[in-house]
Amino acid sequence: MKLRILVACEESQAVTKQFRALGHEAYSCDILPESGGHPEWHLQQDVTKLLEQQWDLIIAFPPCTYLTVTGNRWFNVEKYGDKALKRIEDRKDAINFFMLFANANADHVAIENPVGIMSTEWRKPNQIINPFQFGDPFEKKTCLWLKGLPELTATNIVEPAPRKFFESGKSMPAWYAECWHLPSDERSKMRSKTFLGIAEAMAKQWSEHIIKTKTNGH
């Protein structure tokens, strides 16, 4: 059974390619051009109209810039004035965009984001995963909000690389620290890209679940 799948906010095509490898009709969508090498699978447009179509599965990676807890200090109006007010408006827009996927008319939906404000603005995620549970030795706490889908089962738990510590006493995951030398736009892409092990697990486990569900008529 071939499934029709929309992977929203994914210029890397990391997840899209894994579903394609299993024979499914998967499309990445982003306002940016694809960087995964398959423009024929990429819908470079606003995702809103696409959500009106029929999809067997929607996976969304909405931008986290204004949703993550790490940026909370920039919302201090007394300290940052108009810049903070602008970020507050941008955060409202980001929440509304996230909720487009939460309210999408599809039986099977997954939304991915780092730990952030959506846990209180909407609801807590169904699951929090890390790449090191799926064969990639990296730490990147990732939240999944699921509709009609099972939680991902770890496929290969490995030891994550040691965190990078700084003179200030602060630390960050090794992969994240390695991104700092990149230009801001490239750094953003690297930080948001889905690790291979997680992409493979999403494609295999969720497609199998949906096919089983459709076959059994539930």
Language-model region placement:
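Conserved active-site and SAM-binding loop architecture
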Residues: 1-218
